[in-house]
Structures are given as C-alpha cells and as structure tokens.
C-alpha cells in the first residue's frame, strides 16, 4: 500500500515542473506559473480576465477569508499576466509553506467564477490595469512592437480592452484549458524542494486534471514593419528585433551595453531589454522625451550607430554579473560584435515630428 502511494506521488510530481532554492532567511515566495498568457488566448484579453479572477471566491473559502487568513499569517497573494504566463504568487513566512501551497491549489482547482464577480470586480480591476499601463507611453510602444513583429501568438494583446466580448463561460472554458498539470511550473524561493514537492502532491494542485501541453515549441514567424500612435504626453520612438534562442547571448549583452556607461548611446536611450521565451525572444530599445524633435534626433543617432559593426565585447563581464544576480545565467563568452539589420519600429506621441521607419 505504501509502495503504491509513493508511486502515485512520484507520478504526480512528474506532471509538474517543480524547482526550489532554499535560503537562510525567514521569508519565502512561491510562484505557480501557468502557460496561459496572452499568446495562448483564443479571445483577446481573456488571459487578463482569468488572471483577475484569481483569489476570488473558491468552493470552500470566500475571497475575504482567503485574504484575511493570509494577512494574519503575514503573507500576501498576487496574480499577474504576461505574454507567456498567468502567474499566481504568494509571499509568506517559511514555516507557513503548507498553508500557502493549499491556498494556491484551491484557487487553481476550485475558483467559483460567480456571475456577479465579472462586472462588479474583475472588469473594473482590468480597466484599472489598463489605466495604469497607459500612463507610460513605453508600454504603448512595446505593445505596438510585439504586434508588428509577431502579429499573432506573442503579438496578441495582453490586457483586455473590451474590443471582443468575453463571457463568464468563455473564462471558465479558458481556465479548464490552461489550469492543467501539463501547463504548470512551480517555483519556490527560500523553500526546501523536497518539502515543496511533498506538499504539492498532498494539495489540490495534485488533483488538477490532465490536458494538452500548451507551451509553444515551434519558433513563431517573424515580421518587420511600422506602427504609429498619436497620443498626448511624452513621445517615444522604439525599435525591436526578433531574436532566436541562439542569439540570446548577443542581445543580452547588447541590452546591458546600451544602458551602461560603456556605450556613448546610453544617455539617449530610456531603456533596452531582451524578452526571452522558450522558442524566441524580442530585443527592444526605447527613446523617450517630452520634445518629439529631440526624440527624433536621438533615435536616428541610435539606429545609425547600430547599423555599423558595433563591438560590445566590453560589456560581457558586466552582463554575466547582472544575469547571475537575476538567476538567469547565459554563456556570453563568445559575444563580440552586433550589427542592426531588419527591425520593427513604433512611434508614440507627437508622431508628426517623429521619423518614419524608412527615414532611419
């Protein structure tokens, strides 16, 4: 009997990707990352709405009780969505791991999806997310770059804007599709891995249904193009380069190089980054300012410089250090030069004064 139970626990564990790193501190974090972000959405914004349903009423606990209990234990819950994941996160005192594993399991397995919650709580919260996002023109430029570079898949809009009607039944169906054993990664910080696996197997997470693995493996199709959005406030000119896995190291170094004192371009650039996914990535950089004419001059300087063969090898050690601090090590030892070729372009703000892509 014991042998059968052990075998069942081992089989259950194999369904999940579970990893944890222990530490000497008193605080722990636990993240359940579900491959159910916007790239997998069958309706625009549905992943965002499902994320906002997390930590509402479940079959055995009200949302108020769930929040109150966690606060009494000194913990908190968060739910977020991006292009790849819906992430349920808990922060808590280390000794309370069993409670928070069970709580996350209840949310994944037993969320009630009550009809009144959609108009009264979920939709207002989603509108708030949009209002916060739209205060920063860089977020607008990033959405445009993704849409131009990928169109579908990673190009799908993350936030729900009400363009396409999404019903409660749609959200329930999407939850059934993505909240399955094959689509979940569980990551703990300040957590003993053996304990985490044991508690997961004993929780409702272990009772989640099986389903189709959604994690994208095939490389998405890349495009290049231009998008422009007239909007009040600061202006942004941005470029993006779709990146294959083999190019991750080069563009990690480039992003760190361009935002450090090693590059003469760094004063002109607001931000630069590489977003990495299992099968592709997107490098993007953003020039931002209140004066659109200055933004136009600066983006032209940046692109003109990057079209030359730029030696970025001086940033390898700095990049390696930063990535190690982010727990995202990549071998950058072979990185030398980079030269900008095809790219996507987005202009936001006073677009009458911002250049077109063919002027860069």
UniProtKB/Swiss-Prot annotation:
Q: Which GO terms describe its cellular component?
A: mitochondrial inner membrane
InterPro entries membership: Metalloenz_LuxS/M16, MPP/UQCRC_Complex, Pept_M16_N, Peptidase_M16_C
Q: Which cysteines are joined by disulfide bonds?
A: none
Assigned keywords, A-Z? Electron transport, Membrane, Mitochondrion, Mitochondrion inner membrane, Respiratory chain, Transit peptide, Transport
The transit peptide region is found at: 1-15
Q: Where in the cell is it found?
A: Mitochondrion inner membrane
Assembly and partners? Answer: Component of the ubiquinol-cytochrome c oxidoreductase (cytochrome b-c1 complex, complex III, CIII), a multisubunit enzyme composed of 3 respiratory subunits cytochrome b, cytochrome c1 and Rieske protein, 2 core protein subunits, and additional low-molecular weight protein subunits. The complex exists as an obligatory dimer and forms supercomplexes (SCs) in the inner mitochondrial membrane with cytochrome c oxidase (complex IV, CIV).
Topological type in the membrane: Peripheral membrane protein
Query: Could you tell me what this protein is called?
Result: Cytochrome b-c1 complex subunit 2, mitochondrial
Organism per entry = Kluyveromyces lactis (strain ATCC 8585 / CBS 2359 / DSM 70799 / NBRC 1267 / NRRL Y-1140 / WM37)
Give the source's domain of life in one word. Answer: Eukaryota
Task: State the similarity comment.
Answer: Belongs to the peptidase M16 family. UQCRC2/QCR2 subfamily.
